[in-house]
Design a protein with these regions (language model features):
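Conserved acetyl-CoA-binding loop-helix of GNAT-fold acetyltransferases
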Residues: 114-118, 124-137
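Residues in soluble alpha-helical coiled-coils and helical-bundle/repeat scaffolds
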Residues: 48, 122-123
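A short, structured loop/turn motif at beta-sheet edges
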Residues: 80, 121-122
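Short secondary-structure capping micro-motifs at structural edges
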Residues: 60-62, 71-72, 98-103
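Conserved acyl-donor/pantetheine-binding loop and adjacent beta-alpha core of acyl/acetyltransferases
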Residues: 81-115
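Short amphipathic alpha-helix that is part of the acyltransferase structural core
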Residues: 4-60, 67, 72-77, 81-82
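GNAT-family acyltransferases
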Residues: 41, 52, 63, 89, ...
Length: 137
């Protein structure tokens, strides 16, 4: 695990955006260290398709969940985090060569979807579709 170079609060701060029965979508204002292991575990399913860089670490959680301008959303089922979707303004990715080549780079009008994942056992229930719908709105 990489060294942690930041102060961490244990409790996440979220705002419920949508809910239906046992399912809800929350905007993360701050991802607390109590949720890191769950987020990292969920991200492991991305490694198969996208490689080891897709797995979250405490540092990438700080970068993409707790950075001003990013748009991190989580999905919960019966209170447990089951997935997440993270949007990053394209202009914040100025160190990425491919981002600088995008026709919208510098216009401050584009959100890049950094990650979108829902745990396998919750697929087929419409939860991923609802998370995406909230994210796009």
């Amino acid at each position: 695990m990489e060294p942690e170079l930041f102060q961490q609060e244990p409790t996440s701060k979220t705002q419920v955006i949508a809910s239906s029965g046992p399912f809800q979508i929350e905007f993360i204002e701050y991802a607390g260290s109590d949720d890191y292991q769950t987020l990292i575990q969920i991200s492991e399913s991305l490694v198969e398709e996208y490689g080891p860089a897709a797995k979250l670490t405490p540092n990438t959680i700080q970068t993409y969940f707790n950075r001003d301008g990013c748009l991190p959303f989580i999905a919960r089922h019966q209170g447990d985090i089951i997935g997440y979707m993270i949007g990053v303004p394209l202009d914040m990715l100025d160190k990425e060569p491919w981002a600088r080549l995008d026709i919208n780079f510098g216009k401050h009008n584009t959100i890049y979807t950094y990650a979108f994942v829902v745990q396998k056992q919750y697929k087929g229930n419409g939860y991923a579709k609802m998370l995406k719908r909230v994210y796009l709105n």
